């Protein structure tokens, strides 16, 4: 896998150490993602979604990683949205979220 078009290599990592850091949550499960991205803005998320749609690689968005059942893990792309996002809004009866 290589850095997708329109995504900065500064926020995209395929380094094993980064991938292993996101292979665990508070559960007993271990899934190693193909890549880790730390999107900084809406454009990064749009580019990531376009890439995932094109390549059919699943994305998991992770904030705290506190799941006890493995929901915050993936063997696809891990999108860590902990830093830089100041506001959120839950939409569509909890089916989506808006981050700013």
Spans of features found by a protein language model:
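N-terminal glycine-rich flavin-associated loop
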Residues: 3, 26-59, 80-100
